[in-house]
Amino acid sequence: MTELGDDPDVEALAAARREEALATNQRRLLVLAGDRDAGIDAAFDAVRGADVPDDEVTFVTAREGFRFHRVEPKRASSLLGTTRTLVVLDAHEEFSANALGRVAGAVDGGGLLVLLTPSLDDWPTRRDSFDERLAVPPFSVADVTGRFRGRLVSTLRDHPGVALVDLDSGTVERDGAYRQGISFDAAPPRVPTEKDRRSPRRAYEDCLTADQSEALAALEALTEPGTAVVVEADRGRGKSSAAGLAAGSLAAEGKDVVVTAPGERNAAEVFARAERLLSELGALRGGGAGDFDIAADRGGRVRYVPPTEAGDAAADADALVVDEAAALPVGLLESFLAAPAVAFCTTVRGYEGAGRGFTVRFRDRLDDADREVTDARLDDPIRYAAGDPVESWTFRALLLDARPPVDQLVADATPETVSYRALSPDDLLADEHLLREAFGLLVLAHYRTEPDDLARLLDAPNLTLRALTHEGRVVSVALLAREGGLDPDTRRQMYDGGRIRGNMLPDVFTSQLRDEGAGVPVGYRVMRIATHHAVRSSGLGSRLLTELRDEFADDADYLGVGFGATPELLSFWRDNGYGTVHLSTTRNDTSGEYSALMTRPLSSAGRDLRDRHANWFLGRVGDVLGDALSDLDADVARAALAAVDSFLSPDLSEYEWRVVVGASYGPGLYTTAPGAFRRLGLAHLTNPERASLTPREERLVVRKVLQTHPWDAVADELDFHSTAGAMRALGDAYEPLVDEYGTDAAREERERFR
C-alpha cells in the first residue's frame, strides 16, 4: 500500500496505467473508493492524467453538470456498440451488474475504465435503488443482502490490472501495474485469391482480424441452398461485422437477405457493415442501416424482419442471417430452417450476458436437419489485444465464463446416484467451483442470462436455489421465487391494476383473472430448471421436482411455473403433477409463444386456488380459443387441456345430443349446433384417456370446433384431400365421443343409424 497523503496523486496513477494500456493495446481499471464528491474530483484528475480528449470521455452517473458526455446508469445499454477511450462509472447511487458489464464493453484498447465506489469495506452494506428493486413484497430492502458487492470487492482487490485508490485514507491500495501480462495482437486478415472466394475482395479488406476473414469465408456457404453456418464468438470479436459483410456481399450479387435478431438494436452492426460495404462497392441503391432495409444493385436487398415473422419471410428469400441466435427459443430457431440458406450467429460470452444455450439447446436439431453445416469461431478481440485484464476481470466478477461440469464428470449420473441439497448464497460464495457450476447450468436454462441475475441469486430475499449433485458436481438446478403471502393493502393494489414486483402468479391471478384472494396463499414459482445436457432425459428433472414438493410441503401452499408453452414442456410439467390454470392471450414478442401457467397444490389453500382457477380456465377456454387464441398451435392446445386438473362435463340437452349424433352417425351438420360440439370436444380434450381419438382427429377438433378455422384451411393444414374429407373425418371423430359421453337418448338416436 502506497501512502499519498491528503492529496492522492490520482493523475500520476492514471497516467501510468494509461501508458501501460497504450503500450499493450489493452485496457486498465482504476477504482476510486470513498466519498462520492471526492471520487468525482479524482475522476477529473484521472481524465487529465490519462490525457484523453473530452470528446472521448463518458461519465455514467445520475449526477449532472459535467463537460463530458453523460449517460444515466439506467441507459447504460446505449453504450453497446460504441467505443470510448475513458469511461467513468459512478456506482454510488444506481449501481447494477448490467450497467457495469455494458460500460466495460465500451472501453477501447489503450483506454481506462474508472469505477467510483463507496469505501470498499462499507460498500456491501450500502443499499441503493437496485436493492430496492430486489426487495419484492412481502420483503423489504432490509432483507436484501450485499453478497454480490462483497464478492465484487474481493475481485477488485486481487485481480491483475486493477488500480485501487482509497480516497478516505489517502492511500493507493493497489497500483494495478500489470507489466507481466502477455499481449498478443490479433493476426492480420487473410484475403483469399479470386478463385478461392465468392465475396468481393473489398469485403475481406474490411476485416480486422484473421478470425473475421475466416468467418466471412465460412459465411460464403450461404450462396448455396441447403446450407447452414454457425458463427460463435465472445463479445467484441467482430461476429456481427462479419455477418454484415457477408450480407452486403450477397446483396451485391442481387440476393435477397433477411436479417433477424431479438430486436433491431441487436442487428444494428450487421446493417452498418452491410451498408458501408455496398457503398464502397458502388452498389448501394437506397435505404440504409438506420432504416434496417438496404437496397442494392441487381435487386439485392438486406432487410430486418422480427423473429416471429422471419421464418416465413426467409422462405421466399435467398438467405437468412440470425444474430444473437442464443437469445431466441428453439421453436423459432427451427422455423428459420425454412430459409434456403441460414447463418446462426451468437455471442457465447458478452458483457451484457451469456448465451451458450444455443449449442446445447439447438445444435443437435441442426445437425439432424438436411443441411450442410459450416462452423466458425472468432477468438481474437477486435478493439483490444488478447489477455486484456479488464475483460478477464469482468468475466470473473460477473460470471460470464461460468460453465457446468465437463460431461465426463457427470455422464453416469442417475436419479439413484444423486443427492439433493439446498444451495444457499453463503454456500455458493464459499465454493467458487460450486457457484460456477450452478450458475453455468442456470445460464443454459434460459435464452439470455444477464449479470443482474447473479446479483439477484446472491442477494434477493425471495429467491432460493436447489440442486442435485453427483459426486459433488452439480447436475440439475432449480431456481425458485417465493410468491404470495401478501397483506390486504398489497392485494388490493394488485387487484386495482398496480404492478407488484416478484409475484408473477399472484399478479396474473389477481389483476387479469380477478381473484383478489390469490395473493394470500404462499407459493414457490420455479423460475428456471435445468439439467446437465450430458444426462438429460434420464429423470433428473423429475427427481428434482419431487424433492422440491417434499421439501416445501410444510412451508408453502403450492408450487407453480410459467413458461412459453410447447407440447413437450406442458407434458413434462403435467407428468410431474402440475396442472394448467391459464394460457396468456398474447404472444411473447421474442419467442412467439403463448405462456402457460401451471400449479401443483401442497395444502388445502393451494388446492382451493388450483381448483377455482382450473374451473375458471375451463369455463373460458372454449371462447378464448375461438378468439384471442385462434392461432394457438393445435398440439399446444391439446397438451394444455390434457394437463388441466379438472374435467369438463359436456352437459348437452337432449336436442343437442340428437344434433351431435346426427352429424357423427347420420346425415346431420356440425354447423347446426357448434356449441354442443365445442363442449363435447372440450370434455374429451380435458380427459383424453376416456375415448380413443388419434392425434390428427384431436387436431381437427381443435382447429375446426374450438378455433373455428375455415374448412379449406383445416383441410390443407391437416392434409385432407378435400374439405368434404375433413367434414367426414370430423363426424367420424365424434362417434367415439358419443359412445363414451352420450346419454340414453343419445344412444337411442345412434341406434337409428346402425
From Swiss-Prot:
Does this UniProt record's set of keywords contain DNA damage? no
**Could you state a single Gene Ontology molecular function term?**
ATP binding
| Spans annotated as Disordered | 181-202
Q: What broad class describes the main subcellular location of this protein?
A: cytoplasm
Q: What happens when the gene is disrupted?
A: Mutants lack the ac(4)C modification, but do not show any growth defects.
In the record, which residues are listed under signal peptide?
none
Q: Tell me the domain of life.
A: Archaea
Protein name in UniProt: tRNA(Met) cytidine acetyltransferase TmcA
Keywords, in A-Z order: Acyltransferase, ATP-binding, Cytoplasm, Nucleotide-binding, RNA-binding, Transferase, tRNA processing, tRNA-binding
Q: What does this protein do?
A: Catalyzes the formation of N(4)-acetylcytidine (ac(4)C) at the wobble position of tRNA(Met), by using acetyl-CoA as an acetyl donor and ATP (or GTP).
- Which Enzyme Commission number(s) are on file for it? 2.3.1.193
Q: Where does ATP bind?
A: Q212, G236, R237, G238, K239, S240, S241, A242, A243, G244, L245, R383
Looking up NCBIfam families in the UniProt record yields: RNAactase_tcmA_Halo
Gene Ontology biological-process annotations: rRNA acetylation involved in maturation of SSU-rRNA; tRNA acetylation; tRNA wobble cytosine modification
Transferase is among the record's keywords = yes
Any one GO cellular component localisation term in the record? cytoplasm
